[in-house]
């Protein structure tokens, strides 16, 4: 249920974002269809993973930032971004990539006359995030037992794992055992960095570039986000056993349900193609488009450098769909401009 609610909320935020950016009924209607099919029928919504639960918060950040008008200060939207991002970061830390993209977009468009206003927004964002995260941490400590920070895997572990050749930078059990074998956190970090350096040096410059390109393909080539590799372990039918429920369960759970996988793959390839058009016709004078572009660039760089899993990209689907719809909208505007120019010449 939580996965369905999270997905539905993400669909609403994504569609509203597309409308805010394009004001095109046709493009917005198409986004409704794509979001409903691609997100609503994606098998990852039945798995209790943070990749799904963080969807509404990350898509809310997308909507709040893209709905702000340049001529208005938009403090309410900034507060919404802070709350949504803080909750999202607690669920999935990679939400911070979207926040960094916002900061970079604001800096890129910074003018001297806006320094005080930007500083005020940054104070609201930073202070609000600290307060919200503090409240969340206090609530977590009150409900759950204190976690052992020394036993937690740090970024060095995922950096090391992301450079292994055996699984092409994805999850590697040997690396997990190697990290767990060292109890001292500082020595563990030193070992992880040393292993990473050794692996990179063995690849060489061109070998490293090729390796990271392979990881980029691994992250982006599957419209089911590697469901057959990671998610199909969740194969036991639970809950209701009515005829309708069983058909619905078999639709999502069954490993031999090729139809939905083919549909998802077709939509995903179409989205990727339209994102390419978004990049081709990208206007760097558009702050919101720059934010979307930097967010997508950021998550892909993250997956290239650290551990790569296709499902880590699932939470950024609202950004992909929005970019795809902008790519389609830009193409329409370009075609319209060419037609108008021809008519004017005639």
Predicted regions and their residues:
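Multi-pass, polyprenyl lipid-linked donor-dependent membrane glycosyltransferases
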Residues: 2-6, 30-60, 65, 91-98, ...
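Membrane-proximal stem/loop segments at transmembrane-domain junctions that anchor or position
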Residues: 142-242
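Membrane-interface transmembrane helices that cradle and orient dolichyl/undecaprenyl
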Residues: 22, 59-77, 107, 112
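Transmembrane-helix motifs of polytopic, lipid-linked glycan transferases
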Residues: 2-22, 60, 274-278
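Specific aromatic-rich, kink-prone transmembrane helix
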Residues: 13-16, 53-70, 83-85, 102, ...
């Amino acid at each position: 249920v939580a996965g369905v609610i999270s997905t539905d909320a993400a669909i609403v935020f994504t569609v509203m974002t597309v409308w805010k950016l394009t004001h095109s009924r046709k493009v917005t209607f198409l986004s409704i269809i794509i979001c409903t099919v691609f997100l609503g029928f994606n098998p990852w919504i039945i798995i209790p993973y943070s990749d799904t639960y963080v969807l509404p918060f990350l898509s809310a950040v997308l909507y709040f930032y893209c709905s702000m008008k340049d001529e208005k200060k938009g403090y309410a939207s900034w507060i919404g971004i802070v709350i949504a991002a803080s909750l999202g970061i607690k669920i999935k830390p990679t939400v911070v990539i979207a926040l960094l993209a916002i900061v970079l977009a604001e800096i890129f468009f910074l003018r001297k006359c806006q320094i005080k206003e930007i500083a005020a927004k940054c104070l609201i964002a930073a202070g609000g995030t600290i307060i919200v995260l503090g409240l969340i941490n206090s609530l977590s400590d009150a409900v759950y037992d204190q976690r052992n920070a020394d036993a937690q895997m740090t970024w060095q572990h995922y950096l090391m794992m992301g450079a292994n050749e055996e699984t092409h930078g994805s999850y590697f059990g040997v690396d997990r055992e190697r990290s767990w074998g060292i109890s001292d956190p500082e020595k563990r970090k030193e070992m992880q960095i040393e292993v990473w350096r050794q692996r990179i040096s063995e690849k060489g410059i061109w070998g490293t570039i090729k390796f990271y390109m392979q990881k980029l393909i691994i992250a982006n080539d599957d419209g089911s986000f590697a469901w057959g590799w990671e998610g199909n372990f969740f194969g036991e039918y639970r809950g209701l056993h009515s005829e309708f429920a069983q058909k619905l369960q078999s639709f999502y759970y069954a490993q031999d349900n090729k139809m939905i996988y083919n549909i998802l793959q077709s939509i995903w390839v179409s989205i990727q193609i339209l994102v390419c058009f978004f990049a081709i016709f990208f206007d760097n004078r558009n702050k919101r488009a720059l934010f979307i572009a930097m967010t997508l660039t950021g998550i892909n760089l993250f997956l290239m450098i650290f551990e790569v899993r296709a499902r880590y990209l699932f939470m950024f689907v609202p950004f992909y769909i929005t970019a795809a719809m902008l790519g389609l909208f830009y193409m329409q505007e370009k075609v319209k401009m060419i037609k108008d120019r021809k008519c004017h010449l005639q």
